[in-house]
């Protein structure tokens, strides 16, 4: 996949359209410790994509119901 470079600026609508078309995953992990004792751990994975994009990639990795049921 090649990175496209343009000299013109993109509008917010173009950016949102590209994110929904391609999808984006934000994976975050944080830990709060005091004197070596873990007080709080947070893990988060946020997926932003259109329903069509999600279903296309979820089916490819076997996350949909139709992919889970053997034929």
From Swiss-Prot:
It comes from Microcystis aeruginosa (strain NIES-843 / IAM M-2473). It holds the Pfam family Gas_vesicle. The gas vesicle shell is 2 nm thick and consists of a single layer of this protein. It forms helical ribs nearly perpendicular to the long axis of the vesicle. Keywords: Gas vesicle. GO terms for cellular component: gas vesicle shell; vesicle membrane. The keyword Protein biosynthesis does not apply. This is Gas vesicle protein A. Gas vesicles are hollow, gas filled proteinaceous nanostructures found in some microorganisms. During planktonic growth they allow positioning of the organism at a favorable depth for light or nutrient acquisition. GvpA forms the protein shell.
């Amino acid at each position: 996949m090649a990175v496209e470079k343009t000299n013109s600026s993109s509008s917010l609508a173009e950016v949102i359209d590209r994110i929904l078309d391609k999808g984006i995953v934000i994976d975050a992990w944080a830990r709060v410790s005091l004197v070596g004792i873990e007080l709080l751990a947070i893990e988060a994975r946020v997926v932003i994509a259109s329903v069509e994009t999600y279903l296309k990639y979820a089916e490819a990795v076997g996350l949909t119901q139709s992919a889970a049921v053997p034929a």
